[in-house]
Regions:
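The feature marks the mature, well-folded catalytic cores of soluble enzymes
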Residues: 1-201
Length: 201
């Protein structure tokens, strides 16, 4: 099973971005103007390679809203609207739900399936065949179970992975190519994973 992407949904950087959640206090304050400029270039790049890019307006009441991947997990014609682990981020989901519903996708509201389920999309990695879900500070076992019950009936295996360090699974793992995951060389992710250490580039 492979997924061909021809559409992206993005969300603009709010001017309140300097109030975004963080694990540690940064050495320097966020340069919001620069962040907006960089995000604009990112959006223009997407528009150069994809037929359709949908933009959701920023919400000044939601400083983290530009991290739109945390609000939904989409595979094929099915979208799970997540319940983000940080309560302050939960209002971000409604506008994203509206956009995805308008595309005709089947919508599954995680909070309606299980009010205790929590998931940030940053903990969800889809390889085109299977779904890896990080169990982290922001994603719990109940959230994993909602994803399993939604996507495994569609033929997508779903696996939970404990995230020991870092905020999200995709902070320490990324999908590089068919059958290749790049994993941080530390104890961030629990479990035995067949791997090959590559020399520094």
């Amino acid at each position: 099973m492979t997924e061909h992407c021809d559409l992206a949904v993005v969300r603009r950087v709010p001017s309140s971005f300097f109030e975004a959640l963080r694990m540690d206090e940064p050495e320097h304050a966020i340069d919001v103007a620069k962040a907006k400029e960089q995000h604009d270039r990112y959006v223009q790049t997407l528009k150069g390679i994809l037929p359709t890019v949908l933009e959701v307006a920023a919400d000044e009441a939601c400083p983290d809203c530009m991290f739109i991947e945390d609000t939904a997990v989409v595979i094929g014609a099915t979208a799970v609207i997540t319940q983000p682990g940080a309560p302050s981020r939960r209002p971000e989901t409604r506008p994203v739900r509206d956009v995805l519903s308008g595309l005709g996708l089947t919508i599954v509201d995680m909070s309606a399936v299980n009010p205790d389920a929590l998931t940030d999309g940053g903990d969800v990695l889809f390889t085109g065949r299977e779904l890896f879900v990080g169990l982290s500070k922001r994603t719990n076992a109940a959230g994993l179970e909602v994803l399993k019950s939604t996507f495994e009936v569609l033929g997508v295996p779903v696996y939970g992975v404990s995230v020991i360090e870092g905020l999200h699974l995709k902070s320490v793992v990324t999908f590089a190519d068919t059958d290749v995951l790049v994993v941080a060389n530390n104890r961030s992710v629990a479990g035995d994973c067949p791997s090959q250490k590559l020399p520094p580039m």
